Swiss-Prot record:
Any one GO BP annotation for this protein: glycolytic process
A Pfam family recorded for this sequence: Gp_dh_C
Name this protein carries in UniProt: Glyceraldehyde-3-phosphate dehydrogenase
Catalytic class of the enzyme: oxidoreductase
Alphabetical list of CDD domains matching this protein: GAPDH_II_C, GAPDH_II_N
Gene coding for it: gap
Species for this entry: Thermococcus onnurineus (strain NA1)
One term of GO molecular function: NAD binding
Residues bound to D-glyceraldehyde 3-phosphate: 140-142, 192-193
Pathway named in the protein's UniProt entry: Carbohydrate degradation; glycolysis; pyruvate from D-glyceraldehyde 3-phosphate: step 1/5
Keywords: Cytoplasm, Glycolysis, NAD, NADP, Oxidoreductase
Length: 334
């Protein structure tokens, strides 16, 4: 029996999760919602994906464009077992009451507060805590990136300080910036540290800057160690950590541009780089401090987490079976 999945919000994250669902042998994509008949809605229809209006109030937009929808969100909820809410930050919390009324499980994204769901989720760190849950929150792209690597060395961590160098906007976003400035988050810690703590219990402080780029985030991470660890040990740990890849400057990976080109060379859909990219040369231990630099593809690293969250909520597989199935279906390298 396949779990029937709906996607509320077919944008940057929603369309990637929708694609990922179609790659699973234990899930079925029932439909997606849009607020307007834009190119993404037309493309979904071309792909044979039923498109629903996100609400009754949006129906005139589709009618005026001659775009036939399969119904509204309410209709979609009658047909699914779980809805993946990929709406803009803050909307998910408002939508929760609708999902509760429909008796449908829901997955929220990192733009929502942790209190929106029963558990905040990163598969490799706390898969078991989502087993059988009705409401799960996949943490943000940045938080997912931090947890992927920090959970791998968690037993060594005394304290973490991470600087988040955030992209200003997604590639298709014309509304956000800056385009000629560096914008600091003047409140310390930034929200990322407390968000990490909703998944793994570590001491962490973060600060953040927004810079004029669209393709990836970069994190500069310093870990104070509570027991000895050498750089070669960290390399071994990361090499054996799922959804983390090591890249070398000597092989031409000098910036985020080459990392995205690597994803393109893999012929990944939307040049997705699901894995967290760690620069191997940046891994260094000085005294009791570990340093490393990593990059996060903000459009895609949370996608496999959404798939694993579905399996956990329906208790369809154990942690490593789910991760293996998801990785294999999406071409994740390890």
């Amino acid at each position: 029996m396949k779990v029937k999945v709906g996607i509320n919000g077919y944008g940057t994250i929603g369309k990637r999760v929708a694609y990922a669902v179609t790659r699973q042998d234990d899930m079925k994509l029932i439909g997606v919602t849009k607020t307007k008949p834009d190119f993404e809605a037309y493309r979904a229809k071309e792909l044979g994906i039923p498109v629903y209006a996100a609400g009754e109030e949006f129906l005139p937009r589709f009618e005026n464009a001659g775009f036939e929808v399969a119904g509204t969100l309410s209709d979609l909820l009658e047909k699914v077992d779980v809805i993946v809410d990929a709406t803009p930050g803050g909307m998910g919390a408002k939508n929760k009451a609708v999902y509760e009324k429909a008796g449908v499980k829901a997955i929220f994204q990192g733009g929502e507060k942790a209190s929106t769901a029963e558990v905040s989720f990163v598969a490799q760190a706390n898969y078991e805590k989502a087993l059988g849950k009705d409401y799960v929150r996949v943490v943000s792209c940045n938080t997912t990136g931090l947890i992927r690597t920090l959970s791998a060395v968690q037993e060594y961590i005394d304290y973490v300080y991470a600087v988040m160098i955030r992209r200003a906007a997604d590639p298709n976003d014309i509304k956000h910036g800056p385009i000629n400035a560096i914008k600091p988050s003047v409140t310390v810690p930034s929200h990322h540290g407390p968000d990490v703590q909703t998944v793994i219990p570590i001491n962490i402080e973060t600060s953040a800057f927004v810079v004029p780029t669209t393709i990836m985030h970069v994190h500069s991470i310093m870990v104070e160690l509570k027991k000895p660890l050498e750089a070669k040990d960290v390399i071994d740990i990361f090499e054996n950590t799922t959804r983390v890849l090591l890249f070398e400057k000597e092989k031409g990976f000098e910036s985020t541009a080459q990392l995205i080109e690597f994803a393109r060379d893999l012929h990944r859909e939307w040049n997705n780089l699901y894995e967290i990219a760690v620069w191997k040369e940046s891994i260094s231990v000085r005294g009791n401090r570990l340093f490393y630099i990593q990059a996060v593809h903000q459009e895609s690293d949370v996608v496999p987490e959404n798939i694993d969250a579905i399996r956990a909520m329906f208790e369809m597989a154990d942690k490593w079976e789910s991760i293996r199935k998801t990785n294999q279906s999406l071409g994740i390298l390890k």
